[in-house]
From Swiss-Prot:
InterPro entries for the chain: Varicellovirus_Gp2_glycop
Name this polypeptide is given: Glycoprotein gp2
Pfam families hit by this protein: Herpes_gp2
Membrane-protein topology: Single-pass membrane protein
This protein's GO CC annotations: membrane; virion membrane
Cellular compartment(s): Virion membrane
Leader sequence segment: 1-25
Gene of this entry: US4
Task of the protein: The glycoprotein gp2 from the avirulent strain Kentucky A (KyA) is probably non functional since this strain harbors an in-frame deletion of 1,242 nucleotides in gene 71.
Compositional bias (Low complexity): 24-75
Main location: virion
Organism: Equine herpesvirus 1 (strain Kentucky A)
Annotated glycosylation sites: N48, N128
Lineage of producing organism: Viruses, Duplodnaviria, Heunggongvirae, Peploviricota, Herviviricetes
Aminoacyl-tRNA synthetase recorded as keyword: no
Membrane-crossing residue ranges in chain numbering: 354-371
Length: 383
């Protein structure tokens, strides 16, 4: 009897050991499958516990040590596949979440799985990498550029550009009085300085030329906003830029002849100072007493004007004789550069004698023809 009971007890123990081994194999396979799913989800851009090592439930000491690996070949493949996904997903060591943070970057179209992003703006892959860094200029030393030009021949337009990041107010002065009453505007913009964008304040002043005297000093002042506008502004507390208003146009010389053909007039405009003038008639150069000249000084809207006049002496017209050319040369000194220059020469031809002689000849011929017709007209017989 005791032998029978011992045999039954051994059989029960064998069945129990077989049951425990099957349970361990099933749990290990389930854990490996979940590990493979975790690796796949990590590569798609989510953070989970795939980077932690895969563990299986503890087994009893009575189970064979190789039952976990030999019970199912899919378990080893699942673990190998999960390890492969963990290697692709990457991740920084010591990361609190264990995996890589692959959230799409706002400045990129598609995220790279091998890049790691953080919120550090100094990092090359930081989120603020696309923002242009504008250098900060000293608020007390702005850079000013001033230019003056002519707009549509009737307006003087001045432009003042101030490179600054501070809140400044721009004031204009022509001579001593301010010009706040005229049309002006201020805009904020960005300019490129040596390939670097900088903030700038641009003020534009537009004044009719009739209200401006050329060669007057114009000043652009960039002042703090707490100063009072107008004549009360202390320019010592501002950053200023000044220049001289140029003439509205370019210097020009023209020769005009009177309707009777007895005078040649040379007019030179847009002069800074009174020039010297010389006349040449054909190959002969006239002396200073051979012509007269009048100087008109600088006035609002115009620079100096020189008018010179030469008397044309009539000569007996002969067929085939060449007409005389009148040459007016004006040499002006530039007060700003102290450079003498010869203005473009103006040529004109006097053909009034030829026209008058031709007209007189045609008239005489017409009269002779009429007289001949009257004399040769047959007379009627009177009975």
């Amino acid at each position: 009897m005791g032998f029978i009971y011992a045999r039954k007890l051994l059989l029960c123990m064998a069945v129990s050991i077989y049951a425990i081994g099957s349970t361990t194999t099933t749990e290990t396979t389930t854990s490996s499958s979940s590990t493979s799913g975790s690796g796949q989800s990590t590569s798609s851009g989510t953070t989970n516990s795939s980077s932690s090592p895969t563990t299986s439930p503890p087994t009893t000491s009575s189970s064979p040590p190789t039952s976990t690996h030999t019970s199912s070949p899919s378990t080893a493949n699942a673990q190998k596949h999960a390890g492969h996904h963990r290697g692709r997903a990457g991740g920084r060591r010591g990361s609190p979440q264990g995996g890589s943070h692959t959230t799409p970057h706002p400045d990129r179209l598609t995220p790279s799985p091998d890049d790691t992003y953080d919120d550090d703006t100094n990092h090359p892959n930081g989120r603020n990498n696309s923002i242009e860094i504008v250098p900060q200029l000293p608020p007390d030393r702005p850079i000013i550029e001033l230019g003056v030009a002519t707009l549509r021949k009737n307006f003087m337009e001045a432009s003042c550009t101030v490179e600054t990041n501070s809140d400044l107010a721009i004031f204009w002065k022509i001579g001593k009085p301010s010009v706040d009453a005229f049309n002006r505007g201020t805009t904020h913009t960005r300019l490129m300085r040596n390939g670097v964008p900088v903030y700038a304040l641009v003020s534009t002043l537009r004044v009719p030329w009739l209200n401006v005297i050329p060669l007057t000093k114009i000043t652009c002042a960039a002042c703090p906003t707490n100063l009072v506008a107008g004549d009360g502004v202390d320019l010592n507390s501002c950053t200023t830029k000044s220049t001289t208003i140029p003439c509205p146009g370019q210097q020009r010389t023209h020769i005009f002849f009177s309707a009777k053909g007895d005078r040649a007039v040379c007019i030179t405009s847009e002069l800074v100072s009174q020039p010297t003038i010389t006349w040449s008639v054909g190959s002969d150069r006239l002396r200073n007493d051979g012509f007269s000249q009048t100087w008109y000084g600088i006035q609002p809207g115009v620079c100096g004007i020189l008018r010179s006049e030469v008397r044309i002496h009539r000569t007996t017209w002969r067929f085939g004789s060449t007409s005389k050319d009148y040459l007016c040369e004006v040499s002006a000194s530039d007060s700003k550069t102290s450079d003498y220059k010869v203005l473009p020469n103006a040529h004109s031809t006097s053909n009034f004698a030829l026209v008058a002689a031709t007209t007189l000849t045609v008239t005489i011929l017409c009269l002779l023809c009429c007289l001949y017709c009257m004399l040769t007209r047959p007379r009627a017989s009177v009975y």
